[in-house]
């Protein structure tokens, strides 16, 4: 039996309708061409980034999970405490974010899928975090137009922006590069980073509606702003193998290689053109892709990357 514990009301994390990072679907390639097919059952159907609420199919994901007899699903449950005995996790405590009622989950094996290494950190697992030059958090957004004029309130609390201070949101989409918080604390200051991103989005739309973009956007209106940020770099739990750039580029054939990854080494930095207004806290990024990765084949990730090197029953 598996207890799937999720602190949001929907499944999918960054791939849910709350954040809307689409699944590119580069599967059926490399050494393990079939294993990625498991995600096709519940992957989004987005045609653009960010896609629509309907394209991310939150309800479909939940139906699929609840149909599995061996999964007990606990939505809206936030894990906050871990019990450890002799380097083994014995229990995880989670509280219902709606009622504050706490539940103690015991088990044999535990998987930390928090994205922040939270369970590992609470259990005393070895981990690392890049001190400087980290990637940030994105809050994507979308806007629309109609035949009648739409008003938009002035936003004195937002960032003070003009049209030249941000990339124009083409095709009515503010994409992944609306990213902030590069060297901020991705865990302790997550809400502060999210709020700064909000101020950037609303400052940009204020420029479109009430400042130098007003003549061309009289009929524009916001359709969606991600109120949950999509984080990137955070804690990295140590396994028995640390996969290196050299391993990835050379397609090193580990004896315990078990899954393929087909994305290139993709580093994000503040985009200089748009960092001038707020150099200490930029909000627009650029992506620099490593050219050495063969994305038609990918690279095998060894099993030894997927478990903690010092907590015996933690994945």
Give, region by region, the residue ranges found by the protein language model.
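Soluble metallo-hydrolase cores and metallopeptidase-like ectodomains found primarily
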Residues: 73, 87, 295-297
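Conserved N-terminal/central alpha/beta ligand/cofactor-binding core
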Residues: 5-83, 136-138
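Short low-complexity, flexible loop/linker segments enriched in glycine and/or proline
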Residues: 17-21, 88-89, 142-144
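Flavin (FAD/FMN)-binding glycine-rich loop and adjacent Rossmann-like elements that form
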Residues: 14, 101-109, 113-315
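Fold-independent oxyanion-binding glycine-rich loops
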Residues: 7-8, 77, 92-97, 113-114, ...
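Hydrophobic anchor at the start of a short beta-strand
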Residues: 2
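Conserved beta-strand-loop-beta-strand element in the redox core of flavoprotein oxidoreductases
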Residues: 83-104
């Amino acid at each position: 039996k598996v207890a799937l514990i999720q602190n949001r009301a929907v499944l999918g994390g960054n791939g849910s309708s709350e954040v809307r990072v689409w699944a590119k679907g580069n599967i059926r390639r490399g050494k393990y061409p079939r294993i990625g097919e498991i995600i096709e059952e519940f992957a989004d159907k987005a045609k653009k980034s960010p896609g629509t609420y309907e394209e991310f199919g939150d309800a479909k994901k939940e139906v699929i999970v609840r149909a599995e007899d061996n999964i007990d699903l606990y939505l809206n449950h936030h894990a906050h405490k871990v019990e450890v005995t002799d380097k083994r996790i014995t229990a995880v405590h989670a509280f219902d974010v709606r009622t504050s009622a706490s539940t103690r989950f015991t088990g044999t094996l535990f998987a930390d899928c928090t994205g922040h290494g939270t369970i590992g950190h609470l259990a005393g697992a070895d981990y690392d975090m890049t001190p400087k030059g980290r990637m940030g958090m994105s809050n994507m957004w979308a806007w629309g137009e109609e035949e009648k004029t739409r008003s938009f309130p002035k936003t004195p609390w937002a960032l003070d922006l003009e049209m030249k201070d941000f990339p124009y949101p083409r095709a009515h989409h503010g994409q992944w590069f609306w990213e902030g918080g590069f060297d901020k604390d991705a865990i302790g200051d997550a809400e502060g980073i999210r709020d700064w991103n909000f101020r950037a989005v609303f400052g940009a739309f204020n420029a479109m509606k009430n400042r130098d973009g007003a003549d061309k956007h009289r009929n524009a209106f916001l359709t969606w702003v991600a109120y949950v940020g999509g984080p990137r770099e955070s804690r990295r739990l140590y396994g028995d193998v640390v996969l290196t750039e050299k391993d990835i580029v050379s397609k090193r054939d580990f004896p315990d290689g078990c899954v393929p990854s087909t994305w290139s080494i993709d580093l994000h930095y503040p985009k200089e053109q748009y960092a001038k207004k707020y150099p200490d806290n930029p909000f627009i990024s650029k992506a620099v892709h490593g050219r050495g990765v063969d994305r038609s084949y990918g690279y095998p990730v060894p099993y030894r990357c997927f478990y903690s090197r010092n907590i015996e029953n933690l994945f």
